């Protein structure tokens, strides 16, 4: 199918590449070594990946709907009450889709449309009702969210075109569906 080969598969591959770059940028955000440049770079990588996701929303049929991937990646609105509750037990597995995906990462990385200040990650958050949340916990949460996001982006890609062995292995390791029965 020309649409799959020329549009859908390349778009999802590029989305995977962009989310990998975001994952790499988030990996530089450790509480002790974080700099404003690291935060700004992660924000730029987020915007690039998010833009690619927006392009892919033109074809949310097939695997995106068959396997409920879209709500997992792009739930809106972010459930801040559930997110705050999660930070009360940050070692728990994140099962609530309303605190995963792009909007969760956006909340961690940005305030009022601008990259957050590095000081907020070195101390406590300044967002209303989140001032009791440590920036270090937010960074750990962001790492869990990006890993989950990456797996689901890979799931989209390999569901349409399972030729990338590395990404297919990641999807299988995460026990995600990529083929209909």
Residue ranges and their predicted role:
Residues 1-181:
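Mature extracytoplasmic or organellar-lumen-exposed domains after removal of signal/transit peptides
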């Amino acid at each position: 199918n020309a649409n799959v080969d020329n549009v859908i598969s390349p778009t999802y591959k590029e989305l995977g590449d962009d989310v990998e770059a975001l994952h790499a940028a988030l990996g530089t955000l450790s509480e002790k070594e974080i700099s404003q440049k690291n935060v700004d770079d992660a924000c730029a990588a987020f915007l690039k990946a998010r833009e690619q996701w927006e392009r892919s929303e033109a074809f949310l049929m097939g695997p995106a709907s068959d396997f409920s991937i879209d709500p997992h990646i792009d739930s809106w609105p972010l459930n801040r009450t559930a997110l705050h509750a999660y930070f009360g037990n940050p070692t728990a597995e994140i099962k609530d889709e309303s605190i995963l995906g792009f909007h969760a990462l956006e909340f961690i990385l940005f305030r009022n449309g601008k990259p957050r200040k590095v000081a907020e990650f070195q101390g406590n958050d300044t967002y209303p009702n989140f001032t009791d949340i440590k920036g270090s916990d937010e960074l750990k949460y962001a790492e869990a969210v990006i890993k989950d996001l990456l797996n689901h982006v890979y799931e989209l890609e390999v569901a349409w075109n399972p030729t990338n062995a590395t990404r297919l292995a990641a999807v299988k390791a995460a026990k995600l569906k990529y083929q209909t029965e």
